[in-house]
């Protein structure tokens, strides 16, 4: 039976090490991204398994499934602009995240309606914004709220 009197060792819990670890991980990610070659898009990427049409809308189920992103983003934005999150220092990051969720629904819906490399950009671009704003939220919630707030825009710009 383990001794519950002693705290479990956690390297990121040691006072003063969180920020250096975060900077090291970030530096490794940036260096890796700069050194690796671009990933080519396979030619068959746009061939969906389910290509059924309904009401004249091609790939109907792929297109309409994006309504969930629009709905979730709308509910999230209502919470940000309502009383749920409005007083939080990270509310701009939450606003960008939920706004990006709406844009994911729109961009991905357009891509699945007309799948090609040009519309794929509008599928992926809002995802990059959402991922980076989510990273700022995680940094703010678990490391330091002010750092997360200040990193929002640099992270979003880095992501796009």
Model features per residue range: what roles?
Residues 3-160:
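Multi-pass alpha-helical transmembrane bundles in non-GPCR membrane proteins
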């Amino acid at each position: 039976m383990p001794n519950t009197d002693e705290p479990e060792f956690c390297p990121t819990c040691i006072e003063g090490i969180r920020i250096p670890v975060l900077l090291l991980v970030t530096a490794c990610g940036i260096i890796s991204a700069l050194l690796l070659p671009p990933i080519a898009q396979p030619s068959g990427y746009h061939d969906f398994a389910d290509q059924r049409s309904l009401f004249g809308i091609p790939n109907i189920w792929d297109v309409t499934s994006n309504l969930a992103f629009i709905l979730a983003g709308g509910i999230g934005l209502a919470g940000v602009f309502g009383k749920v999150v409005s007083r939080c220092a990270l509310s701009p990051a939450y606003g960008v995240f939920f706004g990006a969720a709406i844009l994911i629904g729109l961009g991905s819906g357009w891509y699945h309606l007309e799948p090609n490399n040009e519309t794929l950009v509008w599928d992926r671009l809002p995802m990059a914004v959402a991922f980076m704003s989510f990273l700022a939220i995680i940094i703010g919630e678990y490391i330091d709220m002010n750092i997360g707030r200040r990193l929002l825009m640099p992270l979003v710009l880095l992501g796009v």
